[in-house]
């Protein structure tokens, strides 16, 4: 039966906490029950039978039941894990495509983390360099691990390169993008990354490791360093870019002023630019990174 096989799928994955696994098992039992209630023969289904129509039916049921957006998003994450485990990630569309509303929480408190007081010399050099790339270019964790300097430079020399290119297969939602090179520290980190990639076979992942095994090690190391999932490095990049482009600090790091009409227009333009550099496509998400002048 589908519910039993889904529970077994969870048991086969031993890289996550017991709490996460238990929560996922409970959700999978619910999914199987709801699919059966909606006419699917779960006795003949296996986890590999997951299709878009099953996802759509579950989503339809949750909306009918008045389930909160937060809970729906958690359930969608479980469905994406299922799809990934059976190598059928296309079965579950993005939240945007499924019209699951976005929530943006603005606190005007900085969530940035800095590498300045962290000793990276004692950890794996590949992980250390990925962290520096995240810090310098605002990369996501996966992007920093899969980063291939030769591809990213797009035929440019490091000394006079104007931008880097991120391959769609490295990125969230397969949205490739370019990020400008605006300071010498970025060039310094590109040189280090380039030299390391030569040893690794192209990326920041050791050639003897798969992405999955390297990611597991990466998570253990960053947890021990106290930087969590490293998302705070992207916050730091966004805040530094805002200062660089606007000439004064953003609200999240204590910026306080009454913007002129010209500054309001420039603020909007720069927030959209930073949003694109971070791999987003909407301006309101930047309030999470930069804060909001309206909350001052």
Can you name each region flagged by the protein language model?
Residues 100-120, 173-185:
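DNA breakage-rejoining catalytic core of tyrosine-based enzymes
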Residues 114-142, 265-271:
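Basic, Lys/Arg- and aromatic-enriched nucleic-acid-binding interface segment
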Residues 146-190:
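Conserved tyrosine-mediated DNA breakage-rejoining catalytic core shared by Y-recombinases
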Residues 79, 142-148:
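Alpha-helix N-cap/helix-start motif at helix boundaries, enriched for small hydrophobics
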Residues 45, 176, 209-216, 262, ...:
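Catalytic phosphate/metal-binding cores of nucleic-acid and nucleotide-processing enzymes, i.e., regions
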Residues 7-103:
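N-terminal core-binding DNA-recognition domain of tyrosine recombinases/integrases
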Residues 236-280, 295:
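C-terminal catalytic core of tyrosine-transesterase DNA break-rejoin enzymes
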Residues 182-246:
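Active-site/catalytic core of tyrosine-dependent DNA strand-transfer enzymes
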């Amino acid at each position: 039966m589908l519910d039993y096989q889904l529970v077994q799928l969870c048991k086969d994955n031993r890289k996550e906490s017991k709490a996460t696994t238990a929560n996922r098992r409970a959700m999978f039992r619910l999914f199987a029950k709801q699919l059966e209630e909606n006419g699917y023969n779960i006795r003949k289904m296996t986890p590999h039978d997951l299709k878009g129509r099953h996802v759509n039916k579950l989503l339809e049921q949750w909306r009918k039941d008045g389930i909160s957006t937060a809970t729906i998003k958690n359930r969608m994450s479980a469905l994406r894990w299922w799809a990934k485990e059976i190598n059928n990630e296309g079965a579950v569309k993005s939240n945007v495509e499924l019209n699951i509303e976005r929530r943006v929480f603005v606190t005007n408190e900085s969530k940035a983390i800095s590498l300045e007081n962290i000793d990276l010399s004692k950890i794996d050099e590949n992980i250390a360099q990925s962290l520096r790339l995240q810090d310098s270019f605002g990369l996501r964790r996966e992007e920093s691990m899969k980063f291939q300097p030769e591809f990213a430079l797009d035929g440019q020399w490091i000394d006079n390169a104007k931008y880097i290119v991120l391959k769609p297969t490295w990125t969230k939602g397969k949205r490739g993008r370019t990020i400008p090179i605006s300071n010498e520290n970025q060039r310094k980190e590109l040189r280090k990354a380039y030299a390391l990639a030569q040893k690794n076979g192209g990326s920041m992942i050791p050639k003897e490791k798969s992405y999955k095994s390297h990611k597991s090690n990466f998570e253990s190391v960053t947890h021990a360093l106290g930087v969590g999932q490293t998302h705070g490095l992207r916050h730091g990049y966004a805040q530094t870019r805002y200062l660089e482009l606007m000439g004064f600090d953003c609200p999240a790091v204590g910026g306080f002023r009454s913007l002129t009409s010209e500054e309001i227009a420039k603020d909007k333009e720069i927030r959209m630019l930073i949003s694109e550099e971070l791999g987003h496509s909407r301006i309101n998400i930047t309030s999470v990174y930069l804060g909001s002048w309206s909350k001052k």
